[in-house]
Amino acid sequence: MLNLLLLALPVLASRAYAAPAPGQALQRVGIVGGQEAPRSKWPWQVSLRVHGPYWMHFCGGSLIHPQWVLTAAHCVGPDVKDLAALRVQLREQHLYYQDQLLPVSRIIVHPQFYTAQIGADIALLELEEPVNVSSHVHTVTLPPASETFPPGMPCWVTGWGDVDNDERLPPPFPLKQVKVPIMENHICDAKYHLGAYTGDDVRIVRDDMLCAGNTRRDSCQGDSGGPLVCKVNGTWLQAGVVSWGEGCAQPNRPGIYTRVTYYLDWIHHYVPKKP
Protein backbone atom coordinates (compact mmCIF):
# COMPACT_ATOMS: atom_id res chain seq x y z
CA MET A 1 0.00 0.00 0.00
CA LEU A 2 2.79 2.41 0.90
CA ASN A 3 4.64 1.85 -2.39
CA LEU A 4 1.43 2.12 -4.41
CA LEU A 5 0.60 5.47 -2.88
CA LEU A 6 4.11 6.81 -3.37
CA LEU A 7 4.05 5.81 -7.03
CA ALA A 8 0.60 7.25 -7.54
CA LEU A 9 1.43 10.69 -6.14
CA PRO A 10 4.49 11.86 -8.08
CA VAL A 11 3.44 15.51 -8.35
CA LEU A 12 2.12 16.15 -4.86
CA ALA A 13 4.49 18.44 -3.05
CA SER A 14 5.17 19.43 0.50
CA ARG A 15 5.19 23.16 1.06
CA ALA A 16 8.74 23.85 2.14
CA TYR A 17 11.50 25.57 0.20
CA ALA A 18 14.62 23.97 -1.12
CA ALA A 19 17.78 25.99 -0.52
CA PRO A 20 18.17 28.67 -3.21
CA ALA A 21 21.06 29.03 -5.59
CA PRO A 22 23.41 31.97 -4.93
CA GLY A 23 21.92 35.15 -6.34
CA GLN A 24 18.38 33.85 -5.96
CA ALA A 25 18.45 34.10 -2.19
CA LEU A 26 16.08 36.95 -1.37
CA GLN A 27 13.75 35.93 -4.18
CA ARG A 28 13.18 32.58 -2.52
CA VAL A 29 11.30 33.91 0.34
CA GLY A 30 3.12 34.27 0.71
CA ILE A 31 -0.13 32.93 0.74
CA VAL A 32 -2.41 32.63 -2.32
CA GLY A 33 -5.35 35.05 -2.39
CA GLY A 34 -4.46 36.71 0.89
CA GLN A 35 -3.23 40.02 2.19
CA GLU A 36 -0.61 41.37 4.57
CA ALA A 37 -1.37 40.43 8.15
CA PRO A 38 -1.99 43.25 10.65
CA ARG A 39 0.91 43.69 13.05
CA SER A 40 -1.36 42.96 16.00
CA LYS A 41 -2.41 39.50 14.77
CA TRP A 42 -0.92 36.00 14.82
CA PRO A 43 1.59 36.50 17.67
CA TRP A 44 2.46 32.78 17.66
CA GLN A 45 3.77 32.74 14.08
CA VAL A 46 7.45 31.86 13.73
CA SER A 47 9.92 31.57 10.86
CA LEU A 48 12.39 28.68 10.70
CA ARG A 49 15.81 29.63 9.36
CA VAL A 50 18.64 27.55 7.98
CA HIS A 51 22.24 28.73 7.86
CA GLY A 52 23.77 29.55 4.49
CA PRO A 53 24.99 32.82 2.97
CA TYR A 54 22.48 34.26 5.47
CA TRP A 55 19.83 32.79 7.80
CA MET A 56 17.24 31.86 5.15
CA HIS A 57 13.54 31.33 5.85
CA PHE A 58 12.49 27.86 4.75
CA CYS A 59 9.40 26.97 6.78
CA GLY A 60 6.90 28.33 9.26
CA GLY A 61 5.91 27.18 12.71
CA SER A 62 3.89 28.16 15.76
CA LEU A 63 4.78 28.88 19.36
CA ILE A 64 2.70 26.45 21.45
CA HIS A 65 4.63 26.91 24.72
CA PRO A 66 7.25 29.50 25.73
CA GLN A 67 9.94 26.92 24.95
CA TRP A 68 8.33 24.82 22.19
CA VAL A 69 7.57 25.33 18.50
CA LEU A 70 5.22 23.13 16.46
CA THR A 71 6.06 22.61 12.79
CA ALA A 72 5.93 20.03 9.98
CA ALA A 73 8.18 16.99 10.08
CA HIS A 74 9.15 17.40 6.43
CA CYS A 75 10.66 20.78 7.32
CA VAL A 76 13.20 19.42 9.79
CA GLY A 77 13.52 15.69 9.28
CA PRO A 78 15.34 13.74 8.33
CA ASP A 79 17.47 16.34 6.50
CA VAL A 80 18.03 18.98 9.20
CA LYS A 81 20.19 17.27 11.80
CA ASP A 82 22.66 20.01 12.71
CA LEU A 83 21.13 22.10 15.47
CA ALA A 84 23.78 24.76 14.92
CA ALA A 85 22.40 25.31 11.41
CA LEU A 86 18.84 25.96 12.60
CA ARG A 87 17.31 29.07 14.18
CA VAL A 88 13.82 30.27 15.09
CA GLN A 89 12.59 33.82 14.50
CA LEU A 90 9.55 34.84 16.53
CA ARG A 91 6.70 36.96 15.16
CA GLU A 92 8.13 39.32 12.57
CA GLN A 93 6.19 41.58 10.21
CA HIS A 94 8.83 41.51 7.46
CA LEU A 95 11.41 38.76 7.03
CA TYR A 96 15.06 39.67 7.67
CA TYR A 97 14.41 43.26 8.81
CA GLN A 98 14.60 42.90 12.58
CA ASP A 99 15.91 39.39 13.13
CA GLN A 100 16.51 38.15 16.66
CA LEU A 101 17.23 34.51 15.97
CA LEU A 102 16.85 31.91 18.71
CA PRO A 103 18.89 28.68 18.94
CA VAL A 104 17.22 25.28 19.13
CA SER A 105 18.26 22.63 21.66
CA ARG A 106 16.26 19.66 20.35
CA ILE A 107 14.38 18.50 17.24
CA ILE A 108 11.71 15.84 17.73
CA VAL A 109 10.22 14.37 14.55
CA HIS A 110 7.23 12.06 14.87
CA PRO A 111 8.59 8.49 14.71
CA GLN A 112 6.03 7.42 12.09
CA PHE A 113 6.95 10.17 9.64
CA TYR A 114 8.18 9.01 6.24
CA THR A 115 6.82 11.56 3.77
CA ALA A 116 4.21 14.29 4.14
CA GLN A 117 1.81 12.40 1.88
CA ILE A 118 1.87 9.32 4.11
CA GLY A 119 1.08 11.30 7.26
CA ALA A 120 2.56 11.97 10.71
CA ASP A 121 3.94 15.21 9.24
CA ILE A 122 4.52 16.85 12.59
CA ALA A 123 7.58 17.85 14.62
CA LEU A 124 8.56 19.79 17.72
CA LEU A 125 11.46 22.16 18.28
CA GLU A 126 12.65 22.87 21.80
CA LEU A 127 14.23 26.29 22.21
CA GLU A 128 17.36 26.64 24.32
CA GLU A 129 15.57 29.12 26.58
CA PRO A 130 11.90 29.98 27.11
CA VAL A 131 10.81 33.20 25.44
CA ASN A 132 9.26 36.17 27.18
CA VAL A 133 5.57 36.14 26.39
CA SER A 134 4.05 39.54 25.55
CA SER A 135 1.20 41.06 23.57
CA HIS A 136 3.41 40.83 20.47
CA VAL A 137 4.67 37.28 21.02
CA HIS A 138 2.64 34.61 22.75
CA THR A 139 1.46 31.04 22.36
CA VAL A 140 -1.44 29.65 20.37
CA THR A 141 -3.94 27.40 22.13
CA LEU A 142 -4.07 23.75 21.13
CA PRO A 143 -7.58 22.37 20.64
CA PRO A 144 -9.27 19.83 22.89
CA ALA A 145 -9.32 16.30 21.48
CA SER A 146 -13.09 16.58 20.98
CA GLU A 147 -12.86 19.56 18.60
CA THR A 148 -13.82 18.52 15.05
CA PHE A 149 -13.55 21.83 13.09
CA PRO A 150 -16.66 21.17 10.96
CA PRO A 151 -16.79 21.60 7.16
CA GLY A 152 -17.29 25.20 6.09
CA MET A 153 -15.76 26.66 9.24
CA PRO A 154 -13.72 29.75 8.28
CA CYS A 155 -10.12 29.47 9.44
CA TRP A 156 -6.90 31.36 8.76
CA VAL A 157 -3.50 30.30 7.53
CA THR A 158 -0.44 32.53 7.72
CA GLY A 159 3.09 32.51 6.35
CA TRP A 160 5.79 33.94 4.14
CA GLY A 161 5.50 31.41 1.31
CA ASP A 162 4.78 31.84 -2.40
CA VAL A 163 1.90 34.11 -3.38
CA ASP A 164 1.06 31.86 -6.36
CA ASN A 165 2.49 28.88 -8.18
CA ASP A 166 6.19 29.66 -8.76
CA GLU A 167 5.62 33.29 -7.75
CA ARG A 168 7.78 34.26 -4.78
CA LEU A 169 6.80 36.67 -2.06
CA PRO A 170 8.40 40.00 -3.07
CA PRO A 171 10.28 42.41 -0.76
CA PRO A 172 9.72 43.57 1.91
CA PHE A 173 8.54 39.97 2.55
CA PRO A 174 5.49 40.71 4.73
CA LEU A 175 3.69 38.08 6.76
CA LYS A 176 0.57 37.14 4.77
CA GLN A 177 -2.79 35.81 5.91
CA VAL A 178 -5.72 34.20 4.13
CA LYS A 179 -9.13 32.92 5.23
CA VAL A 180 -9.84 29.36 4.08
CA PRO A 181 -12.89 27.11 4.61
CA ILE A 182 -12.53 23.67 6.17
CA MET A 183 -13.44 20.84 3.79
CA GLU A 184 -14.75 17.43 4.84
CA ASN A 185 -12.07 14.75 4.50
CA HIS A 186 -14.02 12.35 2.29
CA ILE A 187 -14.88 15.16 -0.15
CA CYS A 188 -11.26 16.30 -0.18
CA ASP A 189 -10.11 12.72 -0.78
CA ALA A 190 -12.53 12.36 -3.70
CA LYS A 191 -11.20 15.57 -5.23
CA TYR A 192 -7.62 14.32 -5.00
CA HIS A 193 -8.61 11.11 -6.81
CA LEU A 194 -9.87 13.11 -9.80
CA GLY A 195 -7.26 12.82 -12.54
CA ALA A 196 -4.99 10.69 -10.35
CA TYR A 197 -3.80 7.14 -10.97
CA THR A 198 -4.58 6.14 -7.40
CA GLY A 199 -7.39 3.61 -7.02
CA ASP A 200 -10.52 4.73 -5.23
CA ASP A 201 -9.85 2.14 -2.53
CA VAL A 202 -6.55 3.84 -1.65
CA ARG A 203 -7.07 6.80 0.67
CA ILE A 204 -5.03 9.87 -0.18
CA VAL A 205 -6.43 12.10 2.58
CA ARG A 206 -6.03 10.20 5.83
CA ASP A 207 -7.54 10.53 9.28
CA ASP A 208 -4.57 12.50 10.61
CA MET A 209 -5.03 15.12 7.87
CA LEU A 210 -7.31 18.13 7.50
CA CYS A 211 -8.27 19.92 4.27
CA ALA A 212 -8.92 23.62 3.73
CA GLY A 213 -8.87 26.12 0.88
CA ASN A 214 -10.34 26.61 -2.57
CA THR A 215 -9.26 27.75 -6.03
CA ARG A 216 -8.78 31.34 -4.85
CA ARG A 217 -7.26 30.87 -1.42
CA ASP A 218 -4.64 28.43 -0.18
CA SER A 219 -1.25 28.03 1.46
CA CYS A 220 1.75 27.55 -0.82
CA GLN A 221 5.43 26.60 -0.96
CA GLY A 222 7.35 28.19 1.91
CA ASP A 223 4.33 28.14 4.22
CA SER A 224 5.05 24.56 5.39
CA GLY A 225 4.94 24.00 9.12
CA GLY A 226 2.89 27.13 9.73
CA PRO A 227 -0.41 27.19 11.61
CA LEU A 228 -3.98 26.85 10.43
CA VAL A 229 -6.07 28.49 13.17
CA CYS A 230 -9.81 28.67 13.77
CA LYS A 231 -11.72 30.81 16.24
CA VAL A 232 -13.93 28.70 18.51
CA ASN A 233 -15.99 30.39 21.24
CA GLY A 234 -13.73 33.43 21.11
CA THR A 235 -10.43 31.53 21.32
CA TRP A 236 -7.99 30.91 18.48
CA LEU A 237 -7.21 27.20 18.28
CA GLN A 238 -4.57 25.62 16.06
CA ALA A 239 -6.44 23.13 13.90
CA GLY A 240 -3.65 22.19 11.52
CA VAL A 241 -0.03 22.40 10.43
CA VAL A 242 0.63 23.30 6.77
CA SER A 243 1.73 20.02 5.19
CA TRP A 244 1.28 19.36 1.46
CA GLY A 245 -0.79 19.79 -1.68
CA GLU A 246 -0.68 19.66 -5.46
CA GLY A 247 0.22 23.14 -6.62
CA CYS A 248 -1.36 26.09 -4.82
CA ALA A 249 -5.07 27.00 -5.04
CA GLN A 250 -5.52 24.53 -7.92
CA PRO A 251 -8.94 23.12 -8.93
CA ASN A 252 -9.84 19.98 -6.93
CA ARG A 253 -6.63 20.24 -4.91
CA PRO A 254 -7.29 21.82 -1.49
CA GLY A 255 -4.42 22.41 0.89
CA ILE A 256 -3.74 19.52 3.25
CA TYR A 257 -2.76 20.05 6.88
CA THR A 258 -1.68 17.77 9.68
CA ARG A 259 -4.66 17.45 12.05
CA VAL A 260 -3.42 18.67 15.44
CA THR A 261 -6.06 16.86 17.52
CA TYR A 262 -4.82 13.54 16.14
CA TYR A 263 -1.41 14.13 17.73
CA LEU A 264 -2.28 15.78 21.04
CA ASP A 265 -1.07 12.83 23.13
CA TRP A 266 2.24 12.78 21.27
CA ILE A 267 2.68 16.55 21.63
CA HIS A 268 1.98 16.49 25.35
CA HIS A 269 4.41 13.64 25.88
CA TYR A 270 7.05 16.35 25.44
CA VAL A 271 5.31 19.70 25.87
CA PRO A 272 3.76 20.61 29.23
CA LYS A 273 0.06 21.39 29.00
CA LYS A 274 0.69 24.56 30.99
CA PRO A 275 3.89 26.66 30.93
Curated annotation (Swiss-Prot):
The keyword Transferase does not apply. Keywords: Disulfide bond, Glycoprotein, Hydrolase, Protease, Secreted, Serine protease, Signal, Zymogen. The active site is at residues 74, 121, 224. Transmembrane segments: none annotated. It is found in: Secreted. GO terms for cellular component: extracellular region; extracellular space. It holds the Pfam family Trypsin. SMART domains: Tryp_SPc (SM00020). Gene3D superfamilies: Trypsin-like serine proteases. Disulfide bonds join 59-75, 155-230, 188-211, 220-248. Its EC number is 3.4.21.59. Residues 1-18 form the signal peptide. It comes from the Eukaryota. InterPro entries: Peptidase_S1_PA, Peptidase_S1_PA_chymotrypsin, Peptidase_S1A, Trypsin_dom, TRYPSIN_HIS, TRYPSIN_SER. CDD domains: Tryp_SPc. Isoform 1 and isoform 2 are expressed in lung, stomach, spleen, heart and skin; in these tissues, isoform 1 is predominant. Isoform 2 is expressed in aorta, spleen, and breast tumor, with highest levels in the endothelial cells of some blood vessels surrounding the aorta, as well as those surrounding the tumor and low levels, if any, in mast cells (at protein level). Glycans are attached at residues 132, 233. It is an enzyme of class 3 (hydrolase). Residues 31-272 form the Peptidase S1 domain. Changing residue 76 to L: In allele alpha. Changing residue 53 to R: In allele alpha. Homotetramer. The active tetramer is converted to inactive monomers at neutral and acidic pH in the absence of heparin. Low concentrations of inactive monomers become active monomers at pH 6.0 in the presence of heparin. When the concentration of active monomers is higher, they convert to active monomers and then to active tetramers. These monomers are active and functionally distinct from the tetrameric enzyme. In contrast to the hidden active sites in the tetrameric form, the active site of the monomeric form is accessible for macromolecular proteins and inhibitors, e.g. It is linked to Hereditary alpha tryptasemia is caused by an increase in the copy number (usually between two and three copies) of the alpha allele. Affected individuals have elevated basal serum tryptase levels that are associated with cutaneous flushing and pruritus, dysautonomia, functional gastrointestinal symptoms, chronic pain, and connective tissue abnormalities. It is not clear if the associated multisystem complaints might be due to the coinheritance of a second functional genetic variant. Tryptase is the major neutral protease present in mast cells and is secreted upon the coupled activation-degranulation response of this cell type. May play a role in innate immunity. Isoform 2 cleaves large substrates, such as fibronectin, more efficiently than isoform 1, but seems less efficient toward small substrates. This is Tryptase alpha/beta-1.
